[in-house]
């Protein structure tokens, strides 16, 4: 297999190198063909590589960065002052062809702005969208976008997201003629914001799209659609609410009845139920699907949760590997040519 090189913004996220560097070593252990460029402060990175063996170090390179983009800085300010930052350098490595993808847990708005500036959107796309693939109760997967890259979206942007999501479901997940729905407050055609209703009218005119109408948030994990489209504000709130509920549920499975004296048979039954339910619902654990792809760019960019732990950030690295191997940006660009007008 051909070696694959990824650029990691090691300094991004709530925990910085303390999480991203161990996750990088974990990813190297899992993939012998993977090479990583660790972009950040060498003084912060080097001590965390003490446990890396010679073989791992041979597939690692530290790229020095002078600064870190703060999580609370405005995107426009972040882009203006981004030179020398770990996020910008990681994206520049992709632009220069030294890396095939970039992964960052940093400021979402800054990542969006810099990626659009440096890597450029594909023809016909106004703005990229953050997309992830969520598991549902049918043991299948649903493509969901936008998850926060664009807080305010008009109908044209929502229609473009729908087309990109449909292409990703078909090309990356192998779903033939994927069903596409708009997230709304009801299934009736008269409900929702003007932008959603106008987007619905647009999607009905796209012959290559299997548009099925509106879907409500309580049906997100039911498997009723293969692609779910919304603006970034709604998508981000929906995703984080779902993740919070799932984490609480999984936590309750582990802690139920702790601290109380129980008979041996009750404890045995409890342990069996916990294991059974944990296996049944483990595929919903947010750590297992961390990493949202910034879809619609000419290169591959993966946004990790800022609060991701080591396991979750390693999953984001794996998401980048899969996106590159499947040539997601190239396939999307090729498919969009037939359904979207060229930008001037």
From Swiss-Prot:
Pathway the protein acts in: Lipid metabolism; phospholipid metabolism
Record field: catalytic activity: a fatty acyl-[ACP] + phosphate = an acyl phosphate + holo-[ACP]
CC terms in the record's Gene Ontology section: cytoplasm
Record GO biological process: fatty acid biosynthetic process; phospholipid biosynthetic process
Single GO term (MF): phosphate:acyl-[acyl carrier protein] acyltransferase activity
Keywords, comma-separated and alphabetical: Cytoplasm, Lipid biosynthesis, Lipid metabolism, Phospholipid biosynthesis, Phospholipid metabolism, Transferase
Catalytic activity, EC: 2.3.1.274
SUPFAM superfamilies on file: Isocitrate/Isopropylmalate dehydrogenase-like (SSF53659)
Subcellular locations according to the entry: Cytoplasm
Main location class: cytoplasm
Its biological purpose: Catalyzes the reversible formation of acyl-phosphate (acyl-PO(4)) from acyl-[acyl-carrier-protein] (acyl-ACP). This enzyme utilizes acyl-ACP as fatty acyl donor, but not acyl-CoA.
Subunit architecture: Homodimer. Probably interacts with PlsY.
Similarity-based family: Belongs to the PlsX family.
Name the record gives this protein: Phosphate acyltransferase
Species per Swiss-Prot/TrEMBL record: Cronobacter sakazakii (strain ATCC BAA-894) (Enterobacter sakazakii)
Higher taxonomy: Bacteria, Pseudomonadati, Pseudomonadota, Gammaproteobacteria, Enterobacterales
GN (gene name): plsX
């Amino acid at each position: 297999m051909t070696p694959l090189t990824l650029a990691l913004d090691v300094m991004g996220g709530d925990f910085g190198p303390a999480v991203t560097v161990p996750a990088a070593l974990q990813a190297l252990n899992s993939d012998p063909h993977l090479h990583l460029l660790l972009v950040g402060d060498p003084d912060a990175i080097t001590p965390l590589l003490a446990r890396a063996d010679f073989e791992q170090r041979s597939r690692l390179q530290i790229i020095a960065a002078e600064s870190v983009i703060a999580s609370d800085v405005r995107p426009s300010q972040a882009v203006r002052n981004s030179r020398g930052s770990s996020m910008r350098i990681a994206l520049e490595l992709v632009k220069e062809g030294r890396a095939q993808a970039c992964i960052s847990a940093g400021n979402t708005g800054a990542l969006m702005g810099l990626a659009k500036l440096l890597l450029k959107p594909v023809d016909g796309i106004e703005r990229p969208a953050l997309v992830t693939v969520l598991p549902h109760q049918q043991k299948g997967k649903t493509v969901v976008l936008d998850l926060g890259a664009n807080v305010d979206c008009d109908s044209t942007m929502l229609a473009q997201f729908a087309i990109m999501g449909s292409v990703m479901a078909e090309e990356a997940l192998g779903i033939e003629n994927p069903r596409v729905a708009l997230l709304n407050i009801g299934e009736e055609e008269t409900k929702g914001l003007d932008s959603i209703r106008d987007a619905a009218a647009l999607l009905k005119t796209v012959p290559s799209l299997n548009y099925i109408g509106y879907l409500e948030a309580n049906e997100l994990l039911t498997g009723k659609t293969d692609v779910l489209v919304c603006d970034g504000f709604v998508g981000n709130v929906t995703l984080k609410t779902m993740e919070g509920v799932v984490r609480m549920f999984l936590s309750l499975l582990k802690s139920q009845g702790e601290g109380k004296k129980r008979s041996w048979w009750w404890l045995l039954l409890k342990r069996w139920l916990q294991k059974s339910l944990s296996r049944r619902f483990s595929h919903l654990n947010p750590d297992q699907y961390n990493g949202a792809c910034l879809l619609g760019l000419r290169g591959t960019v993966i946004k990790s949760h800022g609060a991701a732990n080591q396991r979750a950030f390693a999953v984001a690295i794996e998401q980048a590997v899969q996106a590159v191997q499947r040539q997601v940006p190239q396939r999307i660009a090729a498919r969009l040519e037939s359904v979207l007008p060229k930008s001037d």
